[in-house]
Amino acid sequence: MENLKQLQERVAVSDGRAKADLVIKNGRIVNVFSGEIMEGDIAIKNGYIAGIGHFPDADQIIDAAGEFISPGFIDAHVHVESAMVTPSEFARVLLPNGVTTIITDPHEIANVAGEKGIEFMLEDAKGAPLDMFVMLPSSVPATEGEHNGETLHAKQLHPLYKHEKVIGLAEVMDFPSVAKGSADILTKIIDAKQEGGRIDGHGAGLTSADLNNYLAVGIRTDHESTSAKEALDRLRAGMFVMLREGTVGRDLKQTISAVTEKNSHRFCFCTDDKLINDLLTEGSINYNIRLAIENGVEPITAIQMATINAANCHNLPYLGAVAAGYQADIVFLKDLKTIEISKVLKNGQVVVENGTRKEAAFKKENKAKFISPKINHHLSIKDLELPLTNETCYVIGMQQNNLFTEKLMEQVTIKNGKFVPSIEKDLLKMAVVERHHNTGCVGVGIVKGFGLTEGAIATTVAHDSHNIVAVGVSDEAMEKAIDHVTKTGGGIAVVDAAGNVLHDLALQVAGLLSDKPYEEVENDLAGLLKAFNQISKAKGFDPFLTLSFLTLPVIPELKLTDQGLFDFATFQIIPNEVN
């Protein structure tokens, strides 16, 4: 929060009575209010822009040499945990991509560790040159009946609004509870409103009629559009629409045609869930901007969507523009179409120069500490058996680069009254093992699309309850993979037919995040993908993040939880066998 002295100093700079800390000269300023390219010196004092005009003197002068000057980019909805690194490490990845602000929903770690998980994320982000605003998780667990680590009711969330970085209520995923007027979810919404916060939606699979329930209680954003029609339905209903491009949820190309000159002010960008390797090769919101431009959106419009629109969406009045009174979060662009970044300023400090981080800006004196809850289950190989009497079964149809699944009906092989995986038909066994309370709950189902020819993979990243999920060709291989991630305290493992671990990634923080530098995580993810390719013929997608979403019941169409097979259409557990 600013004080009187800082405001007085900024005013003195703006009217020429005092020198600026920094002046940027010879830049072409992207005016996100008017849609114009403008010229003028940019004077910065105490991390804020004091004025644009003629400012001949400063402690430091940067010659932009004709480059474009854009506001810092904003990711309007992201789960840091999907990158499998801590917030302070996440900042090191994002700043070279021009992202200076994120709005995050830490519901992954909250599902494992409750309020302590949220507090850890807030603490770890302190001191990093990145604004991390938090939307409090609304649906922990995502649906009734799941076994996650902690349950967060309104009374647990309310005290967290005191934190200056908490700005609202995150994606309301439990649509049925909204529709039936559940007191707990509506109290959470009321609390957010009373604190002046926004309320995010999660309208996966909802029709325009369903959206009335959302709008009626005050939900004002959505990031789950997978088609232009869905995006327009949400826009017409009065929502801000976040166009998503992540690792699995790749929806921007299918939704971008909804954006027009008249309505673009209601659209912004998000990544939602994106792995480190994709962030490093493609980028973050800068990639969304490029993709939008490649698909017909004017460059300045795309930049507006990534900056001022996102700030307006989340009611952040001092972010998203290069103008007097705004935070000096600035990106230097060599070209508006390619969005090639040369320099990034955060709060008026250069944090990226010539595309390279200035590491001194990213050093944290005290690293936040987190004690992970112990993985707590006792699994027998018999728990992985799937008894069947009917050869016609429901099968989870995994779709590459898509969060939705298909509800398939397939003829399966039964031997001695139990399901037997088929490599030829690509019908594999999938299991979800409850890991938080030693309930003994194990959901077993059938999945198609992973193309395994041997072995198994397992992970403790399993949205949103984050139990252990595994898929494999044999029970023995699945048991080995599950046992390995249990012994490491959480993580991802690939095993071969003999049960040998081909590669793993330990996730020491809640079984979700590594406490290592992102470079090590990137190397391990590459090793995991190489190991997966040794045991699978399926290519062109990320198998680990894809697997982690096959347990999320609030996204259509068929998912698996520790309670069994979950049908989104009926919002209930169904048998594996078709009648």
Curated annotation (Swiss-Prot):
> From which lineage does this chain's organism come?
Bacteria, Bacillati, Bacillota, Bacilli, Bacillales
* Name this polypeptide is given: Adenine deaminase
Name of the gene encoding the protein in the UniProt record: ade
Necessary cofactors: Mn(2+)
Q: Which CDD domains match?
A: AdeC
Q: Which domain of life is it from?
A: Bacteria
Disulfide bond positions: none
Give its E.C. classification number.
3.5.4.2
Q: Which Pfam families match?
A: Adenine_deam_C, Amidohydro_1
Q: Which GO terms describe its molecular function?
A: adenine deaminase activity
**Top-level EC class, please?**
hydrolase
In which family does this protein belong, per the annotation?
Answer: Belongs to the metallo-dependent hydrolases superfamily. Adenine deaminase family.
Catalyses which reaction?
A: adenine + H2O + H(+) = hypoxanthine + NH4(+)
Q: Which InterPro entries match?
A: Adenine_deam, Adenine_deam_C, Amidohydro-rel, Metal-dep_hydrolase_composite, Metal_Hydrolase
Q: Tell me, which GO biological process terms does this entry list? A: adenine catabolic process
Which key words are in the record?
A: Hydrolase, Manganese
